[in-house]
Amino acid sequence: MSTTSDFQTGERVRVAHQGNPQSSSLQADMDAKKALLSQNLNNGHLTARPPRTTGPGIKYGEKKPKKQKGSDDDDEDYVDETMPSEDEEDFDNNEEDEDDDDYEEEGPRKRKAPSKKKLVYPRENYRREDSETPEPEMKRIRTLSDSSDDEWMTKPRLNGSESPIGNVMRTQMAKRSAASKRKIVIDDESEDDFINDEEISEKGSGKGSEKEESEGSGKDSETEEVTMKQGQSLKAAMAKAQKEQKKKAESDEDWEEDEDDMNADGDETPSDDSDIEERRAKRGETKNQKECREFFNKAKKEDLLQQARINDKIADFVLANRPFEIYGAMVAKMKGVTRGTNAIEAYMEFLEKRGILSRILDDCKDHAHTVTKDFERCTEGPLQLPLLKEGCTLHDYQLIGVKWLIMMYNKDLNAILGDEMGLGKTIQIVAFLSYLKQIGKTGPHLIVVPSSTIENWIGEFHKWCPSIQLLTYYGSQDERKHLRHRVKKQKDHIDVILTTYNMVTSKSDDKKFFKNFSLNYVIYDEGHMLKNCDSERYRGLMKVKGKKKILLTGTPLQNNLIELISLMYFVLSKVFNKYCEDITHLLQHFKQLGPALDTKNKALYQQDRIEEAKAILQPYILRRLKNQVLGSLPSKSEQIIEVEMKKPQKQLYDNIVEALQQSEESGDSYGSLMRLRQAANHPLLRRSEYTDQKLDKIAKMLCLREKAYADKKWQHVSEDLAWLSDIKIHQLCERFRCTSKFLLNEQLALKSGKCEQLDVMLPEIQKKGDKVLIFSQFTSMLDILEVYLNIRGYSYKRLDGQTPVLDRQEMINEFNLSKDLFVFLLSTRAGGLGINLTSANHIIIHDIDFNPYNDKQAEDRCHRMGQEKPVHVTRLVSKGTVEVGMLALAKKKLQLEKQVTDGVKGQLDEDALRELKEEEGGEQCGGRDLSKLLSSAISGRYDDVEDDSGDSKNGIDAEEAAKKEDEAVKEPVEKEQQKEEESQPSTSA
């Protein structure tokens, strides 16, 4: 124990310190020297000091006044129990100290052993001979010290304050009183023993001793000249290194200031302190801070307004107060305007995100270079796929596609196979999975497909590679539960799991089922399901974990930011996660727009973002067109027929237009256009036959006769019926016997201009022995066409969203093989994706879509591999109706498609497709296009629709304008499909 002082109160406190276990060698030397000193005393070579009155230990008696010394003079006591107290001698007088100092000059300077009672050895015996046998190690007695200096022991500071005495090494005191000190010579082997416990711990952390030495060296103006010799202390060497490092830093700073002075203007003098401080502040700016300051100094007002959180008031304030010399001054000055600092923060955030995007682009450029180079090389040489069924041969372009997938697999990269519809993406995936099984990568792999294509996938696996063990996870809730129980015992034997989008994202039990597998590849067919990162479905699909992913899509990349960003994050989630937290941060960068952007500037801004996104996606997409790879594919001809509406139909249409002209409501453009489209297609899609009086009678009859309506008031039932179309009311009356007398005459199904045109076309097609596909956007229209076909006596099949999923492929196979079936009725949404109907070569689009790519998907159901006849496509348009405007808009978009050129790896460089837009299988139109179409329909003039129909199609605004209207259509369809899938029976292989 030792005593020291609390520097706040002056109170003496006891501080415990422990010996250093690493100082054993030093202790042994000292014990040997003590023994030698004791021997000399006993032999009479030295005179003993008069004995003290108290025993060994702490002496609290009267203290001898001591000479004022530095902190180095406060030493710790060492007491030898074997030495009697009367033999102790005080060698503190100045004469002996001078003699000792003379002796020290013979060798290197030695650090003094800290001791209040100095142990002095005879000069002739000062150095122990190597042959001398050391005495047994003496026990060290801990004593209390009167010293108030705790720093030399590296004890903790009291109350967080520094010791006023200073650090242990005070070099000016060493010069002044060197004669009064003895140094302990420490050789290389025992150098570490000089450091006490806390110094060892601080040295281990790499911080403590260096910090303490630098603090000590910074307080004193005079420094000790240290010679780097064998006996030099470790602390002295560290202090010198710290001092030299500090001098070098100061020298570098002075050199930079001198260089700035030389580069300054001629009239600037070194005495100009403000300029020097300004230059120092500028040197302290980060790269982004400097770029931000330069932007606010040089940008024009219109450029300022393009940035986020900058309005006219802030822009004017910037122009009035610039230039800003340093970033800090700019921030302080911008506090003078409301939300001025927010504008700076927003621009700094923009610079940060732009830097993130640049780093991502750099990563992708490396991938693009290697992928492009290896893609050219991978087309050379044969590819053996022995697991494919004998007799099944891939086309050359399909082999290239499989080789590309293998290359992406070897590079551990995700991929998007974007071949045009009809080029056999399914077959390429089956062949690729057979290759993985061939090399021992058995999976399991998960394939997620739309409900309408699940049977086609099953058929392709059995046809091309029956050796792959396929599990089809589908069916009702009870059947899926039973299937999950069965699979537990056979999990290791499954190569591929085939399921639908709703199965993956709907029920928690289904999600847990897929988590039980360590999935290798997750493959998504018809990738438009992953083109909207704002949807719940997208977020659910991204939670499906697999080592790698493949996306299949037949549609080209749209100039749509949401779609491109969604695909980017899907393909590059590992890359993006290094730079941003999730997709919302990525989305914010691309969506960041100023509040005052006009349409032109907004389009240019977003086009730049589109170019960036496409550049990122390039290495990961392979896209080929049919006209590039299928030279022998039969031709396809297209025609548009404008038909005259029947008089009652035209009168109904004109009544709707007149009502819209008189109406002041302009918000529901989508609903108004929908009413016009229904009237242009068939009058039964509106309510004209069932008058209000008939509806009252039907309502009263239902409430009187039917249990389902017994608790309802007939007035309320009548009001509900008033919102339905004629065909829906007719179908309701068919359900109940009591209302059968209110059924419509079936001949009304023939009373439309388009049905009359079918009377002209269908007989001619039938005479040629060809088959026909008829597509419609409305299931109600398909109901009317069924009545029409029954009246005319044509055999047909029908497929829409309500068709049981597992019945669909059976219907398709039956239609392709049967010679008696003549017509196939399909809804554009359900029948336009992933099905093969090459037995038909005539396509009739009964009612066109806002998006021409939806109609093109329908065309590709028969214009694809396996087609042997020329394909004829006919679009029916009611003359003088809103459909004329829709057709003009579609022509504009289809013309833009012709301007595309080939890009990397055959991918289309579809930069010209600015106005194209596609959302998850639904028809959709931008808000501005809806307004233009409605205005043209009301005025009856459609000449100006084509001129600038795409102005709002390039960005997110058009998307948001139609978002609410689209959700009203899309959500019920998705829920209905999900409910339908859960009610279907399951199959598993």
From Swiss-Prot:
GO biological process, one term: DNA double-strand break processing
Compositional bias of kind Basic and acidic residues: 124-140, 201-221, 241-250, 277-288, 950-982
Boundaries of every Helicase ATP-binding domain copy: 406-574
Pfam family, any one: Helicase_C
Intracellular or extracellular location(s): Nucleus; Chromosome
Acidic residues bias locations: 72-105, 187-200, 251-276
Domain of life: Eukaryota
Region Disordered, annotated ranges: 1-288, 941-989
UniProt xrefs under InterPro entries: Helicase_ATP-bd, Helicase_C-like, P-loop_NTPase, SNF2-like_sf, SNF2/RAD54-like_C, SNF2_N
Chain positions of motif DEGH box: 525-528
Major location category of this protein: nucleus
Keywords: ATP-binding, Chromatin regulator, Chromosome, DNA damage, DNA repair, DNA-binding, Helicase, Hydrolase, Nucleotide-binding, Nucleus
Gene Ontology CC terms, in alphabetical order: chromatin; nucleus
SUPFAM superfamilies, alphabetized: P-loop containing nucleoside triphosphate hydrolases
Catalytic reaction list: ATP + H2O = ADP + phosphate + H(+)
EC class (word): hydrolase
UniProt binding sites for ATP: D419, E420, M421, G422, L423, G424, K425, T426
Enzyme Commission code(s) on record: 3.6.4.12
Family: Belongs to the SNF2/RAD54 helicase family.
Annotated function: DNA helicase that possesses intrinsic ATP-dependent nucleosome-remodeling activity and is both required for DNA repair and heterochromatin organization. Promotes DNA end resection of double-strand breaks (DSBs) following DNA damage: probably acts by weakening histone DNA interactions in nucleosomes flanking DSBs.
Name this polypeptide is given: SWI/SNF-related matrix-associated actin-dependent regulator of chromatin subfamily A containing DEAD/H box 1 homolog
Species for this entry: Caenorhabditis elegans
Species classification: Eukaryota, Metazoa, Ecdysozoa, Nematoda, Chromadorea
Name of the encoding gene: smrd-1
